[in-house]
Regions:
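N-terminal cap/lid segment of alpha/beta-hydrolase-fold proteins
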Residues: 2-43
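The feature captures the conserved acid-bearing segment of alpha/beta-hydrolase catalytic domains
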Residues: 150-177, 201-244
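Alpha/beta-hydrolase active-site loop
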Residues: 90-111
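Short amphipathic alpha-helix adjacent to the substrate-entry channel of hydrolases
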Residues: 63-81
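C-terminal catalytic histidine-bearing segment of alpha/beta-hydrolase fold enzymes
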Residues: 36, 230-242, 251, 255-308
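Primarily recognizes the serine-hydrolase "nucleophile elbow" in alpha/beta-hydrolase
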Residues: 104-181
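Short beta-strand element of the alpha/beta-hydrolase
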Residues: 45-55
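Mobile cap/lid helix-loop segments that gate and shape the active-site cleft of serine hydrolases
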Residues: 9-17, 144-149, 174-221
Length: 308
């Protein structure tokens, strides 16, 4: 088999029109789960990102990070922005089941979305970055793949060709304990209270935080998939870029994960951004500098179309 690099890098220099629609991709009882699809005009095939929003596993929805989705679509990348079950009502691994299904759903309907199965990646921000990476690393995990495609549908799995992460919570257990230490300090800030509560709501136990953990899975030597990945990180971000007091690794969490991922055979880049993150406040995606452009450029180098 040979591969042909898609002309996404050139698309970064120009924009295209796109269409937006909400579709129901999954239903739990009488509750539909929607995806907002941003689809470039033209014939394709286009790369596609299944987009996983942040919000400490409990908050936000498919509309929250629309600036990123709009930019991707305007530069020739299909954006499939998900709603999924909230950790406020459905604990781990419910959201992972929805996301795993969504990847398979997009593959099943690839021609309708002007893409192909081998052009599909995952993208996520904060807790969404954690979920995206965990689905990518464990595409065949029977817990995550528990929701079947419709009867008679062709078989598809949740393997992806790329993972794009923005300040992911890559180590839920480490972040939980980091927040608890911050709360126990002198004159603690407010952010640890809400972070701890949402960890508790979604994970229910430290054992689950350790098990559903991309960082610790690699350090345990778990056999996982390691598709090409990129981590974008803002400066001054004490919620995602900190030294884990329980680890002997000399650097912060981003550097630790990059080292582990490469040791496992994966290719990953770490990009620091000229933006400030403030604990307890949602990031302003209009002030992330050239992050979106860098994402498009990275996809142009890493998403390929198999031929033959």
């Amino acid at each position: 088999m040979t591969t042909v690099a898609l002309d996404v890098q050139n698309r970064a220099a120009k924009t295209t029109e796109y269409d937006v629609e909400d579709i129901e991709y999954l239903r739990h009882g009488d509750k539909p789960l929607l995806a907002r699809v941003f689809k470039p005009r033209g014939n394709g095939p286009f790369p596609a990102l299944v987009e996983v929003h942040g919000g400490a596993w409990c908050l936000s929805d498919r509309k929250t990070e629309h600036l990123r989705h709009e930019f991707m679509a305007a530069h020739g990348i299909v954006s499939f922005a998900l709603d999924f079950r909230s950790g406020e009502t459905d604990p781990y691994p419910a959201s992972l089941q929805d996301i795993n299904f969504a990847v398979r759903f997009v593959k099943l309907h690839a021609s309708e979305f002007k893409t192909r199965p081998q052009l599909i990646g995952l993208s996520g921000q904060s807790s969404g970055g954690h979920l995206a990476m965990l689905v990518a690393m464990r595409p065949h995990d029977p817990r995550y793949a528990a929701i079947a495609l419709p009867p008679g549908a062709p078989a598809h799995d949740a393997t992806v060709g790329a993972v794009v992460m923005s300040w992911p919570v890559i180590n839920p257990l480490g972040r939980y304990r980091h927040a608890k230490r911050a709360l126990a300090g002198v004159n603690p800030a407010e952010w640890p209270k809400s972070i701890i509560a949402r960890h508790d709501s979604y994970w229910r136990s430290e054992a689950n935080m350790a098990e559903g953990n991309p960082m610790l899975a690699l350090e345990r030597g778990e056999k996982v998939q390691t598709p090409p990945a990129v981590w974008f990180q803002g400066g001054g971000d004490t919620l995602h870029d900190y030294k884990d007091a329980d680890s002997d690794f000399p650097g912060n969490e981003p550097q630790r994960f990059v080292a582990n991922y490469r040791k496992a055979g994966g290719e990953i880049e770490l990009h620091y951004l000229d933006m400030d993150r403030h604990a307890g406040h949602a990031p302003d995606l209009s002030k992330t500098g050239d992050m979106f452009g860098r994402m498009v450029e990275w996809l142009g180098r890493n998403v390929t179309l198999g031929v033959g």
